[in-house]
Amino acid sequence: MFKTLTQNLTKIFDKLVNSGILTENQIDTAMRDVRVALLESDVALPVIKGFIEEVKQKALGQEVIKSVSPGQMIIKIIHEEMINLLASTESTTKLNLNAKPPVNLLIVGLQGGGKTTASGKLALRLKNQNKKVLLVSLDTYRPAAQEQLAIIANSVNIDSLPIVKGEKPLDIVKRAIGEAQISAYDVVIYDTAGRIQIDNVMMEEALAIKKILNPTETLLVIDSMTGQDAVITAKTFSEKLEISGLILSRIDGDTKGGAALSVKYFTQKPIKFLSSGEKLTDLEEFNAERLASRILDMGDIISFVKKAASIVDREEAEKTAIKLKSGKFDLNDYLQQMRSIKKMGGFGSILSMLPGSGKIFDQIDQSKLNSKIIEHQEAIILSMTLKERKNPDIINASRRKRIAAGAGMTVQKVNILLKQYKQISAVMKKTSKMNPKNLLRSGIGKLFS
């Protein structure tokens, strides 16, 4: 989501670091460049003004100008101020479940903003924390909205309240309360009806539901792809419904990212979760320091490790590591790695969490980050014999033609896969001797050139 902002800020930082001793005029110029970068990313003007003033005030201090590395000092100040802009206290960013079960969570937002998917993701997260969860759809207006939530719930073996045709939202709430008590649910998540735009009827209904439920959390789902409209939506919901926190959806989209930097400022409510993609596992706890590091191209290794740990089987990873060191990494291992990468959101998602990624995104053929490529490569490898997977060197021209036909792909795509396999094998053997930045620039980056 922050690709453009990250790239623009990285260019500014490179100038600062390479300048050596900085004058006040150079700092002024850098701050103007930062202001333009934030404006181009749809960050709200009042947010930019306050941010620049804070950074400039600290950056013009004598300790910065006279420091050994003034450029690095300014980057540090920008990083700290961005954390301050995004951060809330830890107690408010954590999901509040402090109530006698069943605990009620109310999910609100505009139609099409990712509210129903976010409800399912949150339910799965709580289920994985050994909570008994019930999902309840209160959207009786959008066709098949209730069925959509039921399908999501069923896909991850979570209970959803049975649908009664023609039942009104407030009646559904009362039935859900009874069911939750009888069946001893720990948490009940209520997915409210959305509207194409905010209206009084929508707000009155949400207020009536909230009054009955007295939820520990009223979470507003904000679509990060809506830009400045996200700020207007957040302000209105915050003022009329007294939300307790925010979930930013579609953060993996190719958008400017300004909404994330603006909504917390205007609502003074904590961002609690970041939602990306359609997979129900794609929900992460918000952490201001890690997001600021990601925006400033410092990487987010902690999130990377956490995501990898939740997806990659440790025993299999250790076996692969041993094979890499011994030089026995074959196409079966390659396939396993590609599947793990796919589960983690694809190459683009992984690169965005590694330090220095912003500098190489311009050098990468973006079409090669497409998740479809992994699916195509999977089809190609599955068209090979076991012998070919274990001994890729035996795959000659006639074998490549047969494999391509079996996978429904071109011979060129088979050639590309085999080339990438060899490149990855070579890169992997060197990883133990390289830090993440060098790996990214000298190794992985070459795979997409």
Swiss-Prot record:
Residues given in the record as GTP binding sites = 109-116, 191-195, 249-252
* Record field: catalytic activity: GTP + H2O = GDP + phosphate + H(+)
Its EC number(s) = 3.6.5.4
The cellular component terms of Gene Ontology attached to this UniProt record, alphabetical and capped at eight, are: signal recognition particle
Q: What class of enzyme is it?
A: hydrolase
Main localisation, per the record?
A: cytoplasm
Coiled-coil regions, chain positions: none
Asked whether the keyword GTP-binding is assigned, the reply is: yes
One Gene Ontology term of the molecular function aspect: ATP hydrolysis activity
Keyword terms, alphabetized: Cytoplasm, GTP-binding, Hydrolase, Nucleotide-binding, Ribonucleoprotein, RNA-binding, Signal recognition particle
On whether Hydrolase is a keyword of this UniProt record, the answer is yes
BP GO terms, sorted: SRP-dependent cotranslational protein targeting to membrane
> Gene3D superfamilies attached here?
P-loop containing nucleotide triphosphate hydrolases (3.40.50.300), Signal recognition particle SRP54, nucleotide-binding domain (1.20.120.140), Signal recognition particle, SRP54 subunit, M-domain (1.10.260.30)
Lineage, top-rank taxon, reads Bacteria
The subcellular localization recorded is: Cytoplasm
What does the subunit section of this Swiss-Prot or TrEMBL entry state?
A: Part of the signal recognition particle protein translocation system, which is composed of SRP and FtsY. SRP is a ribonucleoprotein composed of Ffh and a 4.5S RNA molecule.
Its biological purpose is as follows: Involved in targeting and insertion of nascent membrane proteins into the cytoplasmic membrane. Binds to the hydrophobic signal sequence of the ribosome-nascent chain (RNC) as it emerges from the ribosomes. The SRP-RNC complex is then targeted to the cytoplasmic membrane where it interacts with the SRP receptor FtsY. Interaction with FtsY leads to the transfer of the RNC complex to the Sec translocase for insertion into the membrane, the hydrolysis of GTP by both Ffh and FtsY, and the dissociation of the SRP-FtsY complex into the individual components.
Q: Report the sequence similarity comment from the record.
A: Belongs to the GTP-binding SRP family. SRP54 subfamily.
PANTHER family, A to Z: SIGNAL RECOGNITION PARTICLE 54K PROTEIN SRP54, SIGNAL RECOGNITION PARTICLE SUBUNIT SRP54
Its domain comment says: Composed of three domains: the N-terminal N domain, which is responsible for interactions with the ribosome, the central G domain, which binds GTP, and the C-terminal M domain, which binds the RNA and the signal sequence of the RNC.
Protein name according to UniProt: Signal recognition particle protein
What high-level taxonomic lineage is stated for the organism?
A: Bacteria, Pseudomonadati, Pseudomonadota, Alphaproteobacteria, Rickettsiales
Annotated gene = ffh
